[in-house]
Structures are given as structure tokens and as C-alpha cells.
A protein has these predicted regions:
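Catalytic core of non-heme Fe(II) oxygenases with the double-stranded beta-helix
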Residues: 93-173, 193, 207-210
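Solvent-exposed residues in well-ordered beta-strands and their adjoining turns
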Residues: 16-18, 118-120, 200-204
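Catalytic core of Fe(II)/2-oxoglutarate
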Residues: 154-225
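Hydrophobic residues positioned within well-ordered beta-strands of beta-sheet architectures
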Residues: 13, 88-90, 113-115, 195-199
Length: 225
């Protein structure tokens, strides 16, 4: 018998924004102006430009985002009808030219799910990378590290690799847990700009499903102190 048991896979969902073509046509130019300017601001929060979801012209995008989150929940075999999604922050990210730095490894705090919508990309756009700090399969320290001259690895596979890359396809959205560490990586000379909309989502139970302990009650049932 020769069998490998694979367990506990992480899911990053990639789906289609069905209003993409019209949304891009109507909003691309104005969204460039909403860029949080990573050159001047350490984070989108520092710029104050984190409320894209409040703009009425973006309603179709967030309606489609809801459908995609429903699909993400379905893949996890969760009854999405029990939950409401609340976009807490949303912003525009831009790589204007080949000199723009890639996004450094980070995760998003104070939210449940995060998303990245690829409004404008091409084949040279930076890849989306998910990375893990520790690998449960690395049974000895430094076993999976690589060097120029000597290596214990014969090559990378799904068990020994600590970075997974996803191609940024225009018109699609990635949905993933906010505590997942991620970054972008440049693989080739960029030929065109890359415009994305990213954001954070809080997930709560609907107000009538407060008897479920697997989740947070709806904000309408909270008390602000």
C-alpha cells in the first residue's frame, strides 16, 4: 500500500464579477482618482480612501461580490442563507508602471473575509501569492530551504512549497480568510497598469438567526457603549 493522506486544505475562491465589462467602462477613470497612493500613505487606512462601497456607482460590483461570497460559502458546505455580509473597508490599488513596488506580505486585521477584484490586468501583472510562515510537513528545521549550491529538495510540490501563486485574471475576484498571509510578486516586466479593488468583509448571522452559536449576532442587535 502506498497512499498519501491530504488534509486541511486552505481555500481561496476565484469567481467572476458578472457586471465587469460595464463596470469597467463606466468607472475605470474615476477609480484611478480614488487610489490611496501607496507612495505617500503606508496603508489605505492612512489615506482615508477606504469607503468605496458607499459610492452608489459601485452597487452592481458589490451585488456581484455578494453572489461570489455565497459561492465561496457553498464550497465550504456552509448554509449562506444564515448570514449577512458587511463590507467594512474597500479601496483601490494600482500598479501604474514597471517601477511600482510589489505588495509586501501582510494580512488584514479586524475582518473575517477579504477580497481582491481585478478591474484591469494583463498577462504581465504581478501574481497574487499566498504564503505560510511554517509548514507542518517540514519535520526538520530548514529542510525546505533552498540555496545556490546545495539543496535537499529535488523540486517543489504541494507538500514542500510555502508559496502558492494565483494568476490575476481581469474580471475575477478572489475571496479568502482575512488572516491569510498574502502578497504580490513580479514575474516579468510590466507592460500596462494593474488596477484592483480590495476590501474587508465582516460576516454576521441574520437578525432572526440569533440562536445559532456559530457566528456573531447582527449589528442591529449590538449595543454601542
Amino acid at each position: 500500500m502506498n497512499k498519501v493522506h491530504e488534509m486541511f486544505p486552505l481555500v481561496v475562491y476565484q469567481g467572476t464579477i458578472d457586471c465587469h465589462e460595464q463596470f469597467k467602462k463606466d468607472n475605470l477613470d474615476s477609480l484611478r482618482d480614488y487610489w490611496f497612493n501607496g507612495y505617500k500613505n503606508e496603508s489605505p487606512e492612512c489615506s482615508g480612501r477606504i469607503f468605496l462601497h458607499e459610492k452608489k456607482e459601485c452597487k452592481s460590483l458589490f451585488d456581484s461580490l455578494k453572489c461570489n461570497i455565497d459561492q465561496y460559502m457553498t464550497h465550504l458546505n456552509i448554509d449562506h442563507t444564515l448570514f449577512k455580509y458587511h463590507v467594512a473597508k474597500s479601496w483601490v490599488g494600482a500598479h501604474k508602471d514597471d517601477s511600482t513596488p510589489s505588495v509586501v506580505p501582510h494580512f488584514h486585521n479586524s475582518s473575517d473575509l477579504s477580497f481582491v477584484y481585478y478591474l484591469k490586468t494583463d498577462s504581465t501583472s504581478d501574481k497574487f501569492c499566498v504564503d505560510q510562515i511554517s509548514n507542518s510537513n517540514e519535520f526538520m528545521d530548514c529542510l525546505f530551504e533552498t540555496a545556490e549550491k546545495t539543496n535537499t529538495l529535488l523540486g517543489y510540490n504541494r507538500y514542500n512549497c510555502n508559496v502558492y501563486t494565483i494568476t490575476p485574471i481581469e474580471g475575477t475576484v478572489l475571496i479568502f480568510p482575512s488572516n491569510v498571509r498574502h502578497h504580490t510578486q513580479k514575474f516579468t516586466e510590466r507592460k500596462d497598469e494593474r488596477i484592483i479593488i480590495a476590501g474587508d468583509v465582516r460576516v454576521t448571522l441574520t437578525s432572526k438567526h440569533f440562536k445559532y452559536h456559530q457566528g456573531t449576532t447582527h449589528p442591529s442587535q449590538w449595543l454601542e457603549l
